[in-house]
Amino acid sequence: CHFWIGLCLALAPAGAWVAISADTTGWESILGVESNTWIGRDFAWFPELFFISMGVALWITAFDVNYARMDVEVDRRQGIRSFPATFGLKMTKGLSIALTLGWSICFLFAGLSGHTNVRDYNYPLWIPSVILMGIVNLYVMTSQASKSESSSLDMEKFQQLLFKTSMMTGWVLLASLSFTEGMID
């Protein structure tokens, strides 16, 4: 369930890209092919869009897995097999770390995969933004998650911090791209 939500939301960047690029490239934007021959195919959406979509999938999955920590006992009573209810909080913490490292790496690769000199401007803002938000998310999902297990009030504080951190991640990354695009124009 957690991975499904992440994958569904990962379609948003791909859908936006198709909507924008279909005006200029037509069916090639959907097929992802820049040439009409099978020899020497270039996928227009790879690697930048691929890494952005994968990053979104892992980022949202990491958030949702941690958000499910709040309902572990209810999930177990009702037979819902969320990741934390099925595998426990220790495995949830390990998965959260792996997912956060995964989305950070995907977003870093997206920033490093530019095809033109114009995209080289992503380095000054995109890479530090990804690293900063990856570190902040890791901090929340590790040290703050451990503190949340003592009481329901602590769990509520953790959930609020988790939500704000995850939301802020999106805004910081969007702002770094917007500022970069503004510098280019």
Protein language model regions, located:
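Multi-pass alpha-helical membrane architecture of UbiA-family
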Residues: C1-D185
